[in-house]
Structures are given as C-alpha cells and as structure tokens.
Amino acid sequence: MVSNQRVRLFMLCFCLVNNAVIAATEDENVERKPYIVYMGEATENSLVEAAENHHNLLMTVIGDESKARELKIYSYGKNINGFVARLFPHEAEKLSREEGVVSVFKNTQRQLHTTRSWDFLGLVESKYKRSVGIESNIIVGVLDTGIDVESPSFNDKGVGPPPAKWKGKCVTGNNFTRCNNKVIGAKYFHIQSEGLPDGEGDTAADHDGHGTHTSSTIAGVSVSSASLFGIANGTARGGVPSARIAAYKVCWDSGCTDMDMLAAFDEAISDGVDIISISIGGASLPFFEDPIAIGAFHAMKRGILTTCSAGNNGPGLFTVSNLAPWVMTVAANSLDRKFETVVKLGNGLTASGISLNGFNPRKKMYPLTSGSLASNLSAGGYGEPSTCEPGTLGEDKVMGKVVYCEAGREEGGNGGQGQDHVVRSLKGAGVIVQLLEPTDMATSTLIAGSYVFFEDGTKITEYINSTKNPQAVIFKTKTTKMLAPSISSFSARGPQRISPNILKPDISAPGLNILAAYSKLASVTGYPDDNRRTLFSIMSGTSMACPHAAAAAAYVKSFHPDWSPAAIKSALMTTATPMRIKGNEAELSYGSGQINPRRAIHPGLVYDITEDAYLRFLCKEGYNSTSIGLLTGDNSNNTTKKEYNCENIKRGLGSDGLNYPSLHKQVNSTEAKVSEVFYRTVTNVGYGPSTYVARVWAPKGLRVEVVPKVMSFERPKEKRNFKVVIDGVWDETMKGIVSASVEWDDSRGHLVRSPILLFRSDNDYR
C-alpha cells in the first residue's frame, strides 16, 4: 500500500516537473506575444478597479505580481471588458480556461481595404430630401488612419457647436493642433508605440490619406473644382454633409492591430457616436476572436450600427470578411465612369489603357523601348528585365524614353509592381505596363504611365521589334462613360464559413475610382520620394464603399433617429437595387444590391433584430452559454441577473435562426433535394393602414411558397409573421448557385425585397 502511494506520488511529481520543463523549453524557443483576453461586457466598476481585476487574473497565471504588471499592456473597461498582455502560448491557453474569460486570441495585424458617387446614387445636391437639423446631430466614428482636419472638406463655416450628447475629446499632437465643429473629436491608438516612422507617433494626423478620404466621403462639405491634377474635375461632397466626424486613428504604417481597434471601439461607444465606419479586415475568425465583431456587438447594444468593408480579395468565392450578422458588410461596385489613358504608337496604332496619369505630354512622340531591350544584365544575371524589375535596367538605355514592361508572372501578378518608380529613377519619360488580366481599378503613377490589356501589350511588343526607331506617347487620363453599376473585380465574394447560412456581403456601394479629400501629409502614389501633394485623390477598394454605406445609414437615421441598428440596416437592404453581373456569382458578390438611400428612408417594412435575438442565434451557432452570458453581462457578479442558458432557447428557429433581411442556405453537396424553411417577422414603419402581397421569383425546378401571402397592417409598429418554404430538386441546370427572391408589395410605392440564395460547392458555378 505504501509502495503504491509512493509510486503515485513519484508519478505526480514527475508529471509536474515534466510539464514545467516542457513549458520552459517552449519559453526558450517562443517569444512572448501580445494576446487579447476578452471578458465580455464591462462591469460597473471603475476603470481603475477593472485594471486591477485584470492584473489579479493575469497574476494567477504568471505567478509573480511585478512580472504580471510588466506584461500587461492595456486594459479595456468602458464598454468592453478585457485586457492585452504579452504571453507565451501555454499561458494564453491557461488564461482561456479561467472563469470569466470568453476568449484569448493573439493580436494580429489587419489591413485597410483599400465627386460624383452621390449623384450616381440619386442624392443630387439641392435636389434630395434632407433633415438637416437632425443630420447635424449625427456623429459618425471613423476607425482609420486618422484625418487631415485642415482639408477644405472639413471646413466648419456656419456649423454650430457639437451635439450635447458628445463626450469625446480632441487629442492634439504632431501636425494636429485642433479639431473644429465638423471634425469634433480625434484620438489615436497605438498601444505598442515602438516601430513607428519619425513624426507619425502620438498624433491623429493622417500620414496615409485613407482616413481623410473615407471621412470626407461620409460627411465632407461641398467643395467645387475638386480633382486629382485635373482628373475627374467636379464637386466633391459627402453623403451627409451636415453630420459630424469623430476620427479614431488605429492604422499606422505597419498596419492596424486588433488591440488598437478594440480600444477604439471602447472609446467610440462611450464618446457618443451614432454610426461606426471601419474599412479594415483580415482573416475570418469565430466571432469571439474577431475584434471587429466584438466591438460591433457592444456598439449594437448601445444602438450604434457598424458598417464594414467586405475585403479586396475578389473575385474568388469564400473571400469575404467581416461576417458578423450585427455588422453591415459592404461590397464595392462601379460608377458610370472610367478613366482611360490612351497610348499612341509611332505607326498610328492606339491602345486604351487605364491609370490616373496627370501628366500632359511635352512632345508629340518619345523614343520607345522595352524592358528586355533596356537590360543591363550580363549573361546569367539575376532578375527579369522584361518586367522592369529593380536593378535590371540600364540608365543609358532608359533615359528620356518611354519603357514598355511586360506583365509580371508572380501569382496574382497584374503589373503595377513599381515599374513607374524603377523607370523614373533611371530618368525615363514614361512607362507602359502590360496587365495579365483586365482591371477596372485606376492607380496614380509617378511619371506618365498607362496599364494596357494583355493583347494590346503583345501588339506593342510586335511594334517595338518591327522598327529601328519605335516611338510612343502617353496622353493624360480622360474620363469616359461606362455602363454601371457592376461589381468591382477586387471586391470580395461570399459565401462564408463562420456562419454559413448568413449571406455576406449584405449590400454594395460605390467603391471604384472614388474622388474624395486627401491628406496633405501623404504622397499621391505612396512612394516616400513622391513629393507631389493634392487636396483630393482617387482611390478604389471596399474601403471606399464602406463609408458610402455608413453615410447612407446616417442619412436614414436622420429621418428615423429612434430606429435600431438592425432596422436601419434592413431598410438599406430591402430597398437596394438588384444588379446584373456577368457570371453566376449573383448575390454572393453584391448581397441585396446597390444602396438606394432615397428609397431607404421609406422602406415600408423592416426586419428588426434585438440583442436577445442575436444571442439566440449564437446559441444555434454553437457558442456556449457561459461565453454568451459574459458577452451580455448576464454572468457578471451582479446577483440580480440570471445566468444565460442556451438550453432555455426555443428550438425550431428555421434554417438560419435569425430574422435577417436576406435568405441564404449552403446546401450539403450530397443532398439532391432542397427543403428549407425560413421564419421572418416584419415591422410596419409606414403610415396608415396598408396591405402587402407577396410576389415570388424563382427559377424552374424550385418551389418558393410564402405563408401567408397577404399581410395587413392598421398602424405603425405592428408586427406580422410569415414563413418561406423552399422545395426543389438540385439538377444540372441549377449549377452551384441558385437565386430567387421574395417581394412584399403594397401597391403604394413600397417594395420590400429579400434575396434568396442557395449555394452548393460541388458544381462548377463560375
């Protein structure tokens, strides 16, 4: 008996020592990294008490009080409960098992999703209905690269003082000395401040231009004669020019970190913003490990809608980011204009390229060469001169000439890999870059430049090789008309894998070649040696689409200040304009369609979603009761609150478990039949009695039934329930993506449309 006890004691000691040795070995090989410890809803304790509680929790894992204080970087505590600390992986894992912790995840770097757009959307200046008094009380928080408050787009002439509800601050710093009555607040977040370029730290000033661009798209005042070096000349303005901007700088030269974004959300919610716009994204993660999903949930609890960019990794499927159903995820579509940069060859042939070339030619023709002919590499030298790689061309062969560069062959290569910088450094006169694939996105060039389609590039090569004295000229970019809207090639597509039965993106907005304000601290091309500065610039990305949707949300809120975030989002989705696009991606690329702000202020019916409904959805998605309780504060130390329990949630919530404005289902690849039921509740936001009749559009082979088919309302705020039953057989004609729709029509101008999309990934759906 004694012998067995000794053996057990020995084995216990051995395991403890062995685990300690393993941990020590890990510590030697792994550097401590910042982790975010998310603990749900903030308690009613003071920030000082919250920070001390975080320290005590960390100390239980670290085992040393002074070391714990050294390792803790930051505490959240205004609306979001949690902290950031430098941890080893095994310490993070141990913390994740502690009572009161929802999740522990590594701090990562995320990236920005980088004029006439409001006219294109129907908000023609002086010709659309506005509620200016209420609009001026709306505050949009922009989480981005900061702001240039000196831009004419943020002139506060005639603008009254900030709304009384505003609780934020203007934090001044280098190159940022003041706010005004338009930009009423500015803060910067860089919890780990090392590694910043000189002059960029400790300031909300925008050294990139991105934040100034997005902010002015939302609420910039009207500025006439705005252009980028004469390109796209016209009037620049925001969608809600009387609204206020609060700038939260979370993105720096190195990127945008999770911990900084979460800190900005915590501040913005407390400051009193009404809408949050964040054009940032990264890898898709479970909601409790996604800082944007976490921050947006806490914002939603305070009545704040968060608009997010869908991402720029298109056109492939499963590329969309920002997937939480409580955020509005925005795809990018085109305007009815494009930028054309014509190249003319010495033999009279022309090629229509794309760029933002603000240089007028000084000669009728320039000598033309190619990267291959301008090579300075000896036999066996490293590099590819045909694509104009740095270090492969000779100055004596480039000086004063236009250089043609073939398309790069790297994965995803599409030209534009700095060839303009290479050619300018060798005193070249211009650059023509061949594209592997067509693009709709125009970019600024350091010298005269144009990006031409692959076939045109081949003809240019043939011309160069056919004559002893090839010549070419690159004309200044001009604006031409095009059919629109269409989804931009870069815009990320669904479906998604985190919550497979929620359709993302939700909606689309202009994001291609958008003219808006720019920072005087940022170069036009992003090259450090580009000394040109401009008050306005043209940028593309879902980053540019997101602020259009944020402004549209603010516009709707100016007419309906008491509406919930979900109601505003529903109004924009159900009144959106469906799009026709090439291929079979359908709603996976544009969601419900392009925003139509004028229709959205009178949607007729809305699909509202409460906080409790989102919690039921999280239960259905498999998140545990304890974590959900912490998210809401129901599992806090407050003894008057009951613990949240998913077991008490009513079952039979339908195919998606949420009162979402769109209907989506990812079908198992082995299933030949489709059989789904969606339950929905609509709220009447129209005036007077009304009757709505359901209209269904569905392809052959798919039966879509709405029960009941008629709904009547006597007064505003009345609710009605209905269900949508979908049955069919998945045959070859349906391919992998099937689109349908349900529309509720009251014959008085209200048409409430919900797209239906079924997806099965085993087919060739392209």
From Swiss-Prot:
The pro-peptide lies at 24-113
According to the record, the segments passing through the membrane are none
Peptidase S8 domain sequence ranges:
117-601
Give one GO molecular function term: serine-type endopeptidase activity
Top EC class of this enzyme: hydrolase
What EC number(s) are associated with this protein in UniProt?
3.4.21.-
UniProt modification remark: The C-terminal propeptide is autocleaved.
Query: Would you list which residues are glycosylated?
Result: N175, N233, N376, N465, N624, N638, N668
Question: Pfam families annotated for this entry?
Answer: fn3_6, Inhibitor_I9, Peptidase_S8
**Its principal location?**
secreted
A biological process from GO: proteolysis
Q: Where is the Inhibitor I9 domain?
A: 35-113
Name the active site residues: D144 (charge relay system), H210 (charge relay system), S543 (charge relay system)
Q: Where in the cell is it found?
A: Secreted
What range(s) does the PA domain occupy?
Answer: 365-460
Sorted UniProt keywords:
Autocatalytic cleavage, Glycoprotein, Hydrolase, Protease, Secreted, Serine protease, Signal, Zymogen
Which interval of the chain is the signal sequence? 1-23
Q: Which PANTHER family does the UniProt entry name for this protein?
A: PROPROTEIN CONVERTASE SUBTILISIN/KEXIN
Protein name in the entry = Subtilisin-like protease SBT4.15
